[in-house]
Amino acid sequence: MALLLFGLAAAAEIGGCFAFWSVLRLGKNPLWLAPGLVSLVVFAWLLTRSEATYAGRAYAAYGGVYIAASLVWLWLVEGTRPDRWDLAGALLCLAGAAVILFADRSP
């Protein structure tokens, strides 16, 4: 469930940030900022639904998913295929996120 939640949060965050990127860097219509803001609010709300006990741990685990999702965005939306270094870095980050997320923390 955590990975699905983080995946949805990543889609909302990346979409929201890309709306700002589109306006400020690509000269798109400023009306794109409204759905961008809504998307960023949805992202923040989704991240609070995490089962993690501490916010910092949720953010750290989410970070790996965000990186992988950003590379999917790069490929599917921006039309640039991630290279082997992108993929290697994403795998390292996902491994770290898995350790943070699924580690047994019982005493």
Curated annotation (Swiss-Prot):
<feature type="transmembrane region" description="Helical">
    <location>
        <begin position="1"/>
        <end position="21"/>
    </location>
</feature>
<feature type="transmembrane region" description="Helical">
    <location>
        <begin position="26"/>
        <end position="46"/>
    </location>
</feature>
<keyword id="KW-0997">Cell inner membrane</keyword>
<keyword id="KW-1133">Transmembrane helix</keyword>
<keyword id="KW-1003">Cell membrane</keyword>
<dbReference type="InterPro" id="IPR003844">
    <property type="entry name" value="UPF0060"/>
</dbReference>
<dbReference type="GO" id="GO:0005886">
    <property type="term" value="C:plasma membrane"/>
</dbReference>
<keyword id="KW-0472">Membrane</keyword>
<dbReference type="Pfam" id="PF02694">
    <property type="entry name" value="UPF0060"/>
</dbReference>
<feature type="transmembrane region" description="Helical">
    <location>
        <begin position="58"/>
        <end position="78"/>
    </location>
</feature>
<keyword id="KW-0812">Transmembrane</keyword>
<comment type="similarity">
    <text>Belongs to the UPF0060 family.</text>
</comment>
<feature type="transmembrane region" description="Helical">
    <location>
        <begin position="87"/>
        <end position="107"/>
    </location>
</feature>
<protein>
    <recommendedName>
        <fullName>UPF0060 membrane protein glr4174</fullName>
    </recommendedName>
</protein>
